[in-house]
Structures are given as structure tokens and as C-alpha cells.
């Protein structure tokens, strides 16, 4: 079992093309990991992009402010982009993974013009709530375990949402679509290379049946 600081150190040290899946069971855990990841990037000549779907834009902005990120000023400086899932992941009820990938490339290119890299974080709850799980898997596998875009990315999954919508069976396929996996749950916190994760690791750490 890892101490909390190790997960923070891991996300802060992520490198371009790293593609990480992050399972959490509380909002506090989500914010602690994702905001540490983005804030460290902002301090290291990287832009930050965040896609909301579990919480609203206003909620995320307020949580970032509470964490210590000056949202308004960072947006004015052109270093922070916060988007809602509607129009990004799902548009007019459809998921077009090619369009999503192009969107990430556009943001990367925009930041590159300002001499910045890119750290991106996305809440993935919308795919479960809108029954777009097959499309989600296509998107995650299209990103590849090692990203084609030289950005660092964390795809964030609330375990409670997965359980409530009855999709625990896709947790392992989702893990395999990424290079690394972070688990924070009732059984503790762990970081794995995705090929080393077994069903019993997920069940022990998150206390779910896969």
C-alpha cells in the first residue's frame, strides 16, 4: 500500500505521452490527485486542460480555487482551459472519438504556440450516465497506452458511478487501454503499470467485483 504522497509524486512527475487511468471513490481523492497533477504542470511551463462531466464547470472552478489555483488569472494568461463534456466528449448525443482526439491535438497546438506543454484531465462519468460505454472503450483504445500526442493525460473514473451503472466488467479492459493505473479506494492507494494489474488487485483496492 502506498502512502498518499507517493501518488501525488507520481502524477507530478508524469512525462509527455503518459496515459494514466485513475479510479477514485471520493471527490476529495479526485481533486487531490488531479489538481496536484495540473498545478505542478502549470508551475513547469505546461498548460492545463480539464473536462468536466461528474461536476459542473462552476463546481470545478470553485474546487480549483479552494485548492490554490488562481483560475481567472491562469485562464487570462492562456494557460488553463476548462470545458464541459457536452460538446467535447458527447455532442448531440453522439461520441466521435476522432473528433475528441482532434480536440486534444488542437489544445496541444495552441499551448505549443505559447511555448507550453499540455497536461489534460478528464472526468469520464458522462459515458456511463449516457450509456456510451462501447464508444468510451473505442476512444480510450484510440488514444493508445502511449499517447501519440506528446501530452500527459489522466482519465478519471468514479468507482461509484461504474458500480451504480452496472459496468464493473469493463474496468479491466479500461485499465489495459492505459500505460499506468492509479487506484484510490477503501483498500488503499496503489500505482501499477497496466499490464501488471490483475482482477484481484481491483477487487481488493476498490472493493468491487469485476
For each predicted feature, which ranges?
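Non-catalytic regulatory/interaction regions at protein termini and inter-domain linkers
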Residues: 1-210
Amino acid at each position: 500500500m502506498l502512502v498518499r504522497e507517493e501518488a501525488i509524486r507520481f502524477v507530478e512527475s508524469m512525462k509527455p505521452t503518459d496515459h494514466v487511468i485513475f479510479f477514485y471513490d471520493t471527490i476529495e481523492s479526485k481533486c487531490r490527485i488531479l489538481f496536484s497533477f495540473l498545478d505542478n504542470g502549470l508551475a513547469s511551463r505546461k498548460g492545463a486542460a480539464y473536462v468536466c462531466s461528474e461536476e459542473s464547470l462552476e463546481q470545478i472552478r470553485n474546487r480549483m480555487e479552494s485548492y490554490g489555483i488562481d483560475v481567472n488569472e491562469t485562464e487570462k494568461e492562456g494557460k488553463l482551459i476548462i470545458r464541459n463534456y457536452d460538446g467535447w466528449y458527447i455532442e448531440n448525443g453522439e461520441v466521435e472519438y476522432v473528433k475528441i482526439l482532434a480536440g486534444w491535438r488542437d489544445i496541444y497546438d495552441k499551448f505549443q504556440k505559447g511555448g507550453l506543454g499540455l497536461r489534460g484531465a478528464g472526468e469520464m462519468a458522462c459515458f456511463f450516465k449516457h450509456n456510451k460505454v462501447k464508444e468510451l472503450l473505442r476512444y480510450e483504445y484510440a488514444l493508445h497506452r502511449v499517447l501519440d500526442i506528446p501530452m500527459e493525460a489522466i482519465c478519471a473514473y468514479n468507482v461509484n458511478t461504474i458500480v451504480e451503472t452496472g459496468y464493473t466488467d469493463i474496468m479491466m479492459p479500461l485499465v489495459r487501454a492505459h500505460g499506468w493505473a492509479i487506484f484510490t479506494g477503501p483498500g488503499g492507494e496503489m500505482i501499477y503499470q497496466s499490464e501488471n494489474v490483475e482482477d484481484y488487485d481491483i477487487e481488493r483496492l476498490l472493493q468491487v467485483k469485476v
